[in-house]
Amino acid sequence: AYWLLFTAYALEYRVQETDFATLRAQTLANGEILPTFEEYLIQAKKNTATKLIIEIKDHNTPARETRVVKTILKMVKQHKLVNDVEYIAFRQFVCDELVKYGPKGIKVAYLNGTLTPEYCKGLGYTGIDYNLKVMQKNPQWIKESHDLGLTVNIWTVNDPEGIKWCIDNKVDYITTDNPAEANRQLGSKIDFPK
């Protein structure tokens, strides 16, 4: 089984190296058990208004990464969520495999911050998803990305100044652990849990 790792819960196990029973026995900080990817997809079908962003973590070998990519793509298709999912990964090989094996129009964004927007576009990616510090060093990448039809997400932006920088520079998405502050700055009407 493939697992979704909730890093916010700081489990003390490496998912790839831990057996199913051990992982399943863990209680997360919020009192829930760690869901399988299958359970995550079942829950996601209940709220298709929410876009699913699936991050595929690095694995030990390219063969294993290819197997993980193919399995995830198959499961997403089986659950009829193909149009409700976008994929992100730090490893270029994983992004390449998603483009290679995924359906036409698959949405893939590269996370590592080492490739230019033009290069990402040439690889068939649909976005860049870089750390705030990378983008602050390369702010021209926002306009370049948009001119190429790529989306721009910046992670993980929690402080008010960083959120303001993202908004002022017209990024498409902000990954944050502080959605209330992002909401406040955007003037949105979305109610986030406290």
PLM feature spans:
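Metal-dependent phosphodiesterase/phospholipase catalytic core, i.e.
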Residues: 2-107, 146-148
